[in-house]
From Swiss-Prot:
This is Isoleucine--tRNA ligase. L-isoleucyl-5'-AMP binds at residue 569. It is an enzyme of class 6 (ligase). A motif ('KMSKS' region) lies at residues 610-614. It comes from Helicobacter pylori (strain Shi470). HAMAP family: Ile_tRNA_synth_type1. It is found in: Cytoplasm. It comes from the Bacteria.
Length: 920
């Protein structure tokens, strides 16, 4: 038998079944860097247009986790897909280098070293070194994911030129009249001792006291109402703000009920409050809220006046319908205060402790001085005495600092804001507010998924003014001078441009290093004593939000086009980078800086829970790469519905590895079986069989499906189409049917050569579709197949292009076999009968069979190939009978070479094999 085995076309390929990815990938990625693969990609011009993906910057702090991998791999797949389509691609990775997390790292480091660093320049130098260190670490970790981009010249928000660009964007905001300094309540992180923008706040559950407090009406107010006693009942979960109460807001036109015991609440809520025991149940009088406006009550905590007002924000779903109002500690309170000219009381310091203002304004007694507001709440509640009607504890959603994860407070301070509702001049000469321009711009942007559009619209519709200033050191300074003569900022072009040039040449450290005189242009230096520096820094969201200007516009197209074609980030960036970029783009250019927004979900564990070290459910990216390799991680990303949260566990990666092996083993089979092709056969036409036409038509159909899905960035849909084809039509039908010809026909057999061309075309399509995802693996495929490289005119993966199968194979059309579906139905019924006969021990395999088919119109050759029987239509010993067909024992002997029962003599080759042996 051995001599016959040696005569078969059992071709081998050097492409291994085992990828050994964790060992081989780093070598490939190092080679790509050495050969400057991305520059080569950018140099290829196929005249199919340009494509720019603008990178939202990760933070230059810490190592990468699986969330980073998800984001960067998705971006890489999108960019490579456009590249393989023939577009000139632009992708400049970048890093967000300023901000609080790095400051905290340095402060912790200094604390461990038991040293302090008051010099801001030296402190900033340490921050810069920290960012540089982790930027390089993350850069190398991204490269190990197979991600390609302009990593030789990435953008860094701490580069001098970049800092100058950020500042110039700020200058444009100021020149358009949208930058104002205001004293108003904003989110304040006492843990960071800094203001926060809305994007820097996350909501988590928190337990808070829930109290109902009676504010007794003053004597003159009682007289106006013609009642002897009446107290408005308020409800609050922030008792610490009661010291700053100056008003109570009611709902306009609502009816308020006065109970027998003298408590005044919204009638719509009376029954609920009576059930709780807050007020008594008997109503003795009713008043319209409008008749209560401008009456006065007394704050039971400090006996100060509290004006009764009407507020649009007052609801009748919860509480009492009477809202405690402290303009120093709430945005809605603040705007109501503007309407009623209310006093803004705010006596809480940067650390969240009561300051001396409580004594000067007689708001609280001095025992509260220096006490943290949350700690003081218990005493404040006790101090209310009989005015406290009910105390409970509730758990509710409460704003927390996104960096320290500690609760934040609302605190009125003087900060710099971008105004959302101030009209400014547009490019066409009209005037619109930033909110209006942004909402208009959103309508012109495509969102994937589409729900992202409405999400961003709602956020823009409801967002407050953007608080830009931060009381920190590591960032781009809000580099303006205040003219002490007018107490207004100096927005003179000469001064602003001089500052920008200094930043560009020497970095913005000069704002701390240089005196006012040295920072001013020569024409202003004689009056330096009249100016003082603003010492706040910019919100880091302004840094990252202006990256489109610094990367795309300032380089005048060298690094891509603005607006960019795509931005792609996690869904949390609707309130972060998407929003800050949109607002700055609308100020600078009256349009969004992107054409399409793609968002992905978050990484969660297999139960759908958020990953955390405390839960012990964190999956290590480094461990995944060492266990499976980056191509498997990349395939896992692509094989998931990234628009939702991605569940991850070792089980999911094991499943992905099976998908990877299926693709790899299929490619290995294809490579092996066209490896002995005569290269002359690549250019000539072939006589393709009905079965060849079937698989080629299937290939064309699924190619359209995969392309359509990938165009919509629906990679999981496209991969499922591809995997179904590989598993069902290709492996399950075609390859099985072709093995006899591939292994046993002569090498120059026309049928076999036609099959090889089909395999070659199929491998080409698989490579094209998988290259953006499994780039290393497809690089490996091409390296191990000269035939495929010549067929595709590609020396490596970066030369890949899509092919037209019909053109490559010189076919005008694909002719699907007649009655093919009937043959497949016959095959299915045959396999069921075959399994029964095998179980009964009647036969061992299908080659022992001959078949007689009831439907005479079916092509006998096709039936023989697809059913893998030895004969069709020659009867001998009947094995079984069904309505559709009859099975017989094959009438001849088993060929020792091809194993088909076609030999006329025992232990002798069949006629076909005999002829092949003669030709050898």
């Amino acid at each position: 038998m051995k001599e016959y085995k040696d005569t078969l076309n059992l071709n081998a390929t050097t492409f291994s079944m085992k990828g050994n990815l964790s060992v081989n990938e780093p070598k490939t990625y190092a080679k790509w860097q050495e050969q400057q693969a991305f520059k080569r990609m950018q140099a290829r011009k196929d005249n199919h247009g340009d494509f720019t993906l603008h990178d939202g910057p990760p933070y230059a702090n810490g190592h990468l986790h699986l969330g980073h991998a998800l984001n960067k791999i998705l971006k890489d797949i999108v960019v490579k897909r456009e590249y393989f389509k023939g577009k000139k691609i632009y992708y400049t990775p970048g890093w967000d280098c300023h901000g609080l997390p790095i400051e905290q790292q340095i402060l912790e480091q200094l604390e461990k070293e038991k040293t302090s660093l008051e010099n801001p320049t030296l402190f900033r130098e340490k921050c810069r070194d920290h960012a540089k260190k982790f930027l390089e670490i993350q850069k190398n970790e991204f490269l190990q994911l197979g991600v390609l981009g302009d990593f030789d010249d990435p953008y860094k928000t701490m580069d001098f030129k970049f800092e100058a660009s950020i500042y110039r964007a700020l200058v444009e905001v100021a020149k358009k009249g949208l930058l104002k300094e205001r004293h108003k309540p904003i989110y304040w992180s006492y843990a960071c001792e800094s203001a926060l923008a809305e994007a820097e706040v996350e909501y988590k559950m928190k337990k808070s006291p829930s109290i109902f407090v009676a504010f007794g009406l003053k004597k003159e107010s009682l007289e106006k109402l013609k009642v002897k006693k009446a107290s408005l009942v308020i409800w609050t979960t922030t008792p610490w703000t009661l010291y700053a109460n100056v008003a109570i807001a009611l709902k306009k036109d609502a009816i308020y009920a006065l109970t027998q015991k003298g408590y005044l609440v919204a009638k719509a809520l009376h029954e609920k409050l009576a059930a709780l025991g807050v007020v008594d149940s008997e109503i003795v009088h009713e008043f319209n809220a409008n008749d209560l406006e401008y009456l006065k009550a007394l704050n039971p905590l400090n006996q100060r006046n509290s004006l009764i007002t009407l507020g649009e924000h007052v609801g009748l779903e919860d509480g009492t319908g009477a809202v405690h109002t402290a303009p120093g500690h709430g945005e809605e309170d603040y705007y109501l205060g503007l309407k009623y000219n209310l006093e803004v009381l705010m006596s809480v310091d940067e650390k969240g402790c009561y300051d001396e203002g409580i004594i000067h304004n007689q708001l609280l007694d001095e025992s509260y001085l220096g006490e943290h507001v949350f700690k003081a709440q218990k005493r404040i509640i006790e101090q209310l005495g009989d005015s406290l009607l009910l105390e409970q504890e509730i758990e509710h959603s409460y704003p927390h600092c996104w960096r320290t994860h500690k609760p934040v407070i609302y605190r009125a301070t003087t900060q710099w804001f971008i105004l959302m509702d101030e009209p400014f001049i547009q490019n066409d000469g009209s005037q619109k507010t930033l909110r209006e321009v942004a909402l208009d711009a959103i309508e012109k942007v495509e969102f994937v998924p589409n729900s992202g559009k409405n999400r961003l619209k709602i956020m823009i519709e409801n967002r407050p003014d953007w608080c830009l200033s931060r009381q920190r050191k590591w960032g781009v300074p809000l580099a303006f001078f205040i003219d002490k003569r007018t107490n207004k900022p100096c927005f003179e072009s000469e001064v602003l441009e001089h500052t920008a040039k200094l930043f560009e040449e020497r970095g913005c450290d000069v704002w701390w290093e240089y005196s006012v005189k040295d920072l001013l242009p020569p024409n202003y230096q004689d009056n330096a004593t009249y100016y003082e520096k603003v010492m706040h820094i910019l919100d880091v969201w302004f840094d990252s939000g202006s990256t489109f200007k610094a990367v795309l516009e300032d380089y005048q197209g060298e690094k891509g086009q603005s607006p960019s074609d795509v931005v792609l980030e996690g869904s949390d960036q609707h309130r972060g980078w998407f929003q800050s970029s949109l607002l700055i783009g609308c100020i600078l250019n009256n349009q969004a800086p992107f054409k399409k927004v793609i968002t992905h979900g978050f990484i969660v564990d297999e139960k759908g829970e958020k990953m955390s070290k405390s839960k012990g459910n964190v999956v290590s990216l480094d461990k995944l790469l060492k266990t499976h390799g980056s191509d498997v991680v990349r395939l896992w990303v692509a094989f998931n519905d990234y628009q939702n949260d991605l569940r991850v566990s070792q089980t999911f990666f094991t499943q992905t590895e099976q998908h990877y092996k299926k693709f790899r083993n299929t490619l290995k089979f294809l490579l092996a079986n066209f490896s002995d092709m005569d290269l002359k056969n690549l250019e000539r036409s072939h006589n393709f069989s009905p079965l060849d036409h079937f698989i080629l038509e299937s290939l064309e159909t699924i190619s359209a499906g995969v392309n359509s899905a990938f165009e919509e960035h629906d990679f999981v849909k496209g991969l499922n189409v591809l995997m179904a084809f590989v598993t069902n039509e290709l492996s399950g039908i075609y390859l099985d049917a072709c093995k006899d010809s591939l292994y046993c026909d002569s090498k120059n057999n026309e049928k076999r050569q036609a099959i090889q061309m089909v395999l070659l075309a199929t491998a080409s399509k698989l490579c094209y579709f998988l290259a953006p995802i499994l780039t290393h693996t497809i690089e490996e495929v091409l390296a191990h197949s000269q035939v495929l490289r010549i067929f595709l005119q590609a020396k490596d993966v970066f030369d890949l292009k899509d092919i037209s199968v019909s053109e490559k194979l010189h076919l005008k059309e694909f002719k699907k076999p007649e009655n093919f579906e009937a043959v497949l139905a016959l095959r299915s019924a045959f396999n069921e009968e075959l399994d029964r006969l095998k179980k009964e021990g009647v036969i061992k395999n299908s080659l022992e069979c001959a078949i007689e088919v009831g439907e005479k119109a079916l092509c006998e050759n096709l039936v023989e190939e697809l059913l893998m029987v030895s004969f069709v239509g020659i009867a001998r010993e009947k094995l079984s009978e069904t309505p559709a067909f009859t099975l017989f024992k094959a009438p001849f002997y088993k060929c020792p070479r091809c194993w088909r029962f076609k030999s006329e003599l025992e232990n002798a080759p069949c006629k076909r094999c005999e002829q092949v042996l003669k030709e050898r």
